[in-house]
Regions:
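Conserved RecA-like helicase ATPase core segment
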Residues: 218-306
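Conserved helicase core region in the C-terminal RecA-like lobe
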Residues: 72-81, 205-209, 234, 338, ...
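ATPase/helicase motor core of nucleic-acid motors
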Residues: 78, 258, 326-458
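Accessory C-terminal helicase-associated subdomains
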Residues: 388, 392, 433-544, 557-559, ...
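ATP-hydrolysis module of ASCE/P-loop NTPase motor domains
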Residues: 67-69, 88-177, 405
């Protein structure tokens, strides 16, 4: 693969197979052979990967005294460069770039939703607006016009309301001269196809994480390919975890070979990250996805062993206390399906005073809307005012969010006025609300009455769980999520407040201790960090000595729509489609293959799982279980026997087809 120079190539790489190192060596080899840097383009999936690859490539170039390195870009940054050049040549109209999720974009979505549904209202169902947002994004990335949706029989089942909304969306973008990041990709492809634009002549195009590309990104690669261009793509179908935004496993499992003739296949099937037990259980889980059969991971014989442990009903606090005794100097990741699941470990780490960081945009718990609501309610209950959070830099945002989450009925402009007034006079919140809010309005009267009553409730107990119960009984959490029109955000907020209840019922935390953690969390020196908190999606491409997976109740992952009610947190099961389950299984595969030394999975107590292991089964349960179905598929008992067989080939074990295949791959 390193010496491959002519013809297209598809590299299928398992986790930890050293694909980045191999790609660096290949690019370095091309440069050493005299291939001009400007004739090579390397496309990465995201900014972090782009920066990391560029840094490593520069180090390699310096080692061999190479004067320059090729362009290493993300798809969007490269497409934006083409669009800007098109604008300079007057081939494309100048438009303002608007970020999806920005207030301007959210307002545009609202307008389209109202138009599509032929209503005049200020209320938007969160699930409906997110459905519209995802549909619009995918339609734009598939280059579909409103006419396509109306005239093509393939789209006859799409709701007419969504078709009207999409038509309005396209019209508004043109009217306001706006473009999104999705549009940048489409416009770049259209520019290349126009034959009016001089496409850069590239001899080598390398695309990393190809399993995550969508239709328009694939079209961009095709558009950049000329007779002299050699394209190499690298990826792993088992790590395709972005289907919800257009990625498809078949781009790497068939489409590339269809579009790029005479493709040579390279398989990097040996991992240098983890030991045989983890390789085996990962193979066992992912084998349930029928499109994964071409990929089979084995560990390099010199890899150290990786232990896989399933903990039923174990408290995270207990595991961390034990981990501190055993792995004082190891790196550890606590990984969950959603950001809401990470609330518990963050508070536990604060209680234990262990150095950690959160790998997400919201660096502090109080920056989560539902947690800031809980925090301010507790301040009002204990202190009667908000003076305790004076040191907080984003106080005005906290006040605004507090008012929005409580869902006072306010006339236009009053939200800002009320926010500003309370921000200036934190000690007089009740009088300000009484003065500026129409308390005669029924909902406002109920909310104000509840706020006044919670102060007297605080004397009943100094435990945070007791106060939470009071807030919940008074309905102060009922309107959580209304501050966001995006369903994925609102669901996460509902889930977050629900997990706070579980946490406070599990640990005895006083109100003052909880407020100290939420308002003034202990911050740690970056060089001393030993714990990372991240979602499964956020863990991709990373590795740690130890990985702890949490939130593994089957109702929560993968078998739900992530919409818990309050306070009955997880009683909301629904069946996911087969494709959804495949993607969630791939996500689980990504998460477990981040571990080097030890993989811990915390699951609820489940007698069915004990029965499964006793019978040495690895099939997917057909009946409801407590633990996620994916741990049933791990074939953990056989994996342990396999490790003993590898250590001592004379050991006799009962071979299954999968364990025999693994041993054959090792020539044992």
């Amino acid at each position: 693969m390193i010496k491959h120079t002519h013809g297209h190539a598809l590299v299928k790489a398992v986790p930890g197979s050293g694909k980045t190192t191999t790609l660096i060596m290949r690019v370095t080899n091309l440069l050493k052979q005299g291939v001009e840097p400007q004739s090579i383009l390397i496309l990465m999936y995201n900014k972090a990967a782009q920066l990391s690859f560029k840094k490593k490539l520069q180090t390699s170039a310096d080692k061999y005294n190479l004067s320059a390195i090729p362009d290493v870009r993300t798809f969007h940054s490269y497409a934006l460069e083409l669009v800007k050049e098109g604008q300079r040549l007057n081939l494309i109209t100048y438009k303002e770039l608007v970020e999806q999720g920005s207030p301007k974009y959210q307002q545009l979505l609202r307008e389209c939703y109202f138009y599509g549904n032929e209503i005049e209202s200020s209320f938007v169902e969160n699930n409906e607006i997110e459905k519209l947002e995802l549909n619009i994004s995918n339609w734009r990335l598939e280059e579909l016009t409103p006419n396509d949706l109306n005239q093509d029989p393939n789209y006859k089942d799409i709701d007419k309301k969504d078709k009207r909304a999409y038509k309005k969306y396209c019209e508004l973008l043109e009217q306001y001269k706006l473009r999104t990041f999705d549009d940048i990709l489409s416009e770049a492809v259209q520019l290349i196809r126009s034959n009016k634009f001089s496409v850069p002549v590239l001899k080598q195009v390398i695309v990393d994480e190809y399993q995550d590309v969508n239709y328009i990104q694939n079209e961009l690669v095709k558009g950049l390919t000329q007779p002299v261009t050699n394209v190499m793509v690298v990826g792993d179908v088992n790590q395709c975890i972005y289907e919800w935004r257009g990625s498809r496993p078949d781009f790497i499992e068939g489409i590339f070979e269809r579009d790029f003739k005479n493709t040579k296949i390279f398989n990097l099937s040996c991992t240098f990250r983890y030991g045989h037990q983890l390789s085996y259980v990962a193979n066992s889980v992912i084998s349930k996805n029928k499109d994964s059969n071409s990929s089979f991971c084995i560990s390099h014989p010199k890899n150290k062993s990786t232990e896989v442990s399933i903990h039923q009903g174990l408290n995270l606090l207990k595991l961390l206390e034990h981990s501190e005794k055993e792995n004082k100097f190891s790196s550890t990741a606590i990984i969950a399906r959603s950001n809401a699941d990470l609330i518990e470990p963050e508070i536990v780490l604060q209680l234990l005073n262990l150095p950690y960081r959160v790998k997400s945009s919201q660096q502090k718990l109080i920056s989560r809307p539902e947690i800031s609501l809980l925090t301010l309610l507790m301040c009002l209950a204990v202190d009667g005012d908000l003076s305790r959070i004076k040191p907080t830099a984003n106080f005005q945002w906290l006040i605004r969010n507090f008012i929005k989450q409580l869902d006072f009925r306010l006339p236009k402009g009053m939200l800002n006025e009320l926010t500003l007034a309370i921000s200036k006079n934190k000690d007089n919140i009740f009088n300000i609300i009484k003065e500026k809010v129409d308390i005669k309005q029924e909902q406002n009267r109920k909310i104000f009455k509840s706020l006044k009553e919670i102060n007297s409730s605080s004397s009943c107990s100094n435990m945070a769980s007791a106060l939470y119960k009071v807030f919940n009984e008074k309905g102060l959490f009922l309107n959580i999520s209304e501050s966001s029109i995006l369903r994925r955000e609102s669901n996460d907020q509902i889930r977050g407040i629900s997990f706070m209840q579980q946490l406070l019922n599990t640990f005895e935390i006083t109100v003052n201790d909880l407020l100290d953690i939420l308002i003034n969390p202990t911050e740690h020196d970056e060089n001393k960090i030993r714990y990372d908190l991240t979602t499964m999606h956020g863990s991709k491409g990373l590795e740690w000595d130890n990985v702890i997976l949490i939130g593994l109740e089957d109702k929560a992952y993968p078998g739900t729509n992530n919409e818990p009610t309050i306070p009955k947190e997880l009683d909301f099961i629904r069946t996911k489609s087969n494709d959804d389950l495949k993607e969630e299984r791939r996500l689980f595969y990504v998460a477990i293959t981040r571990a080097i030394q030890h993989l811990h999975l915390i699951v609820p107590t489940d007698k069915t799982l004990d029965h499964w292991n006793k019978n040495v089964w690895s099939s997917t349960p057909k009946k409801e279980t407590n633990a996620t179905r994916f741990v049933f598929e791990m074939d953990l008992v056989i994996s342990r026997s396999l490790v003993e067989k590898i250590k001592d080939p004379k050991t006799k074990i009962e071979l299954t087809p999968r364990s025999k295949r693994y041993l054959d791959a090792l020539s044992l």
